């Protein structure tokens, strides 16, 4: 199943909505923290255990993106979106069965494994297509689509909280909420499957598109078109520097995002104005809004100031934000909330900017497959971030600590990880020409046509 080629006159601005319909759906993953307290209560789980479906989903996201990236390039975005629809929706249906029967392993398998595969394939499905449609503004194009993944929880978080209030927070209410999620997302994601189009070869190879594709990245010198294969990219230090950059940025962001609802309640549990469950769900929605805004805002900014400079901002200022939370967050809700919002905007911006960073370094030839392989950094971060925050919080609670003290050590670790990412970003340099593929030769028919045209004046 391949996506139909766009007819003449097809507007490229119809493609981002197709990507958004998929990314807004799979972005529900960022609202998992809303389900954590009910699951812990209904199934007698610890905070570390209730994070397992989310952690495994992120692991499977990276693995399926890495191993499926080349197939997505070959089979096209419509095939990928269909696979994502089936897996993601089926994951919720299996989780509903697991909750109804009080079998936590089935929730882990359904949401974490099956749903995680849908996350990975769905996440990368529109990326290379968008870059081909928008060679002149790759940061903007991928930001428009990928912001949907960050904004998915903006819808899913209050929606899930409302369903749990209506259905109840016992295992049957959780099962009903999972069931509604699965059926609703199946319908919504089908819109993307029906709408997606790939650019016509003539349009992709037009002089304007070719010139835009060869345009240098902001701050870079003009040069020949870069073409690096996915296999060749793995042999470059640039790929692994970006792997570290993405892993550190995601670990720092996902740690706070996965535990956002219980974290803000713990931080201010002993204050004169504790945070209610509904207010905590609203905080998760705010974080999702910042995540979404960062994906479009910061990725568009990278088209102006350059990818390396914008990652300096993400990692350097991000480390400062974590430090402020550690030092002053427990004493001030505004400081805690503002710093968390800035961090999540950087977290989202990092995801949306990375495809354009890859395009600048490796070209568009196999950027989708390269992006898929890089997302193994997300898999690693999906384990590290929640594990660091949840395990240390459980350990501190067992030691008799409460409030902000539960998170001081883990958030300090996040500060250090962002510094490591900052150093890795500084090490990124242009890819050495020895890794470049030869420029494609013009088809014989085109060459013959050019020869014929050049000879016409002589025969006249």
Pin down the residues of each PLM region.
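Symmetry-related core transmembrane helices of the 12-TM Major Facilitator Superfamily/SLC fold
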Residues: 175-195, 408-427
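Hydrophobic core of transmembrane alpha-helices in multi-pass small-molecule transporters
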Residues: 104-121, 335-349
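C-terminal transmembrane helical hairpin of 12-TM major facilitator-type secondary transporters
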Residues: 246-255, 279-357
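Helix-to-loop junctions at the C-terminal end of transmembrane segments
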Residues: 64-77, 294-307, 393
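C-terminal ends and interior cores of transmembrane alpha-helices
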Residues: 86-100, 317-330
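Glycine-rich segments within core transmembrane alpha-helices of 12-TM secondary carriers
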Residues: 137-158, 372-386
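Intracellular juxtamembrane helix-capping segments at the cytosolic ends
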Residues: 39, 120-134, 141-142, 349-362
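Extracytoplasmic gate region of multi-pass secondary transporters
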Residues: 32-37, 157, 231-299, 385-389
